[in-house]
């Protein structure tokens, strides 16, 4: 029978050897994980639910949708509304909310709430009178990465249509 996991630290310690070589994760002098690995390990612990938690907190998804419909992103939610592959950004947020490969992207798009929300907000951007660049400014590159990712793992038409509209395919 497997050992009960009581905390995030227990989870990380139990699975560290399975995920990577423990020596590359842990500072031998302190016995603690190197700081750069904490967001990734934490994301693995939280799984796909980290997106739901972030989108639901403070009604953030609704705020994001309203901002997109109004034609301008004003607040900070891009990482968990339009996720992209891990490694494309360097911030703690991009590491924590980065998609860890095609399998996790498929899990994301197969989750009924996450799929419906991503399709809804993508359609809101697509149908807006303003361009993706006007709505998102410098964050348009994150939207591009998101659209390319999900167009590659599913057959939902809006992602391919979006990529075609902006010549991203």
Segment roles from a protein language model:
Residues 41, 153-169:
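Charged phosphate-binding loop/patch that engages nucleotide di/tri-phosphates or the phosphate backbone
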Residues 80-83, 142-153:
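Short, hydrophobic/amphipathic alpha-helical patches that form generic packing surfaces
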Residues 5-19, 37-59:
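Extreme N-terminal tail/first-helix region
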Residues 69, 86, 126, 151-155:
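Hydrophobic/aromatic-lined pockets within catalytic cores
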Residues 55-69:
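A long, hydrophobic alpha-helical segment
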Residues 67-102:
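Hydrophobic/aromatic-rich, well-ordered segments within soluble, folded domains that form packed cores
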Residues 107-148:
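Mid-chain, well-packed structural core segment of small domains
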Residues 20-35:
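Acidic, low-complexity, intrinsically disordered interaction modules
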């Amino acid at each position: 029978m497997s050992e009960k996991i009581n905390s995030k630290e227990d989870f990380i310690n139990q699975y560290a050897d399975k995920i990577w070589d423990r020596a590359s994760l842990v500072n031998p002098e302190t016995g603690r994980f190197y700081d750069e690995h904490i967001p990734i390990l934490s994301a693995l612990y939280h799984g796909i639910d980290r997106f739901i938690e972030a989108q639901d907190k403070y009604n953030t998804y609704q705020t994001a949708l309203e901002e997109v419909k109004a034609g301008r992103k004003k607040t900070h939610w891009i990482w968990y509304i339009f996720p992209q592959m891990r490694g494309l950004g360097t911030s703690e947020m991009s590491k924590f909310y980065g998609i860890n490969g095609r399998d996790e992207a498929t899990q994301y798009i197969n989750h009924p709430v996450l799929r419906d929300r991503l399709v809804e907000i993508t359609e809101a951007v697509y149908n807006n009178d303003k361009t993706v660049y006007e709505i998102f400014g410098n964050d348009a590159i994150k939207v591009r990465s998101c659209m390319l990712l999900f167009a590659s793992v599913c057959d939902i038409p809006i992602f391919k249509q979006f990529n075609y509209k902006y010549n991203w395919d």
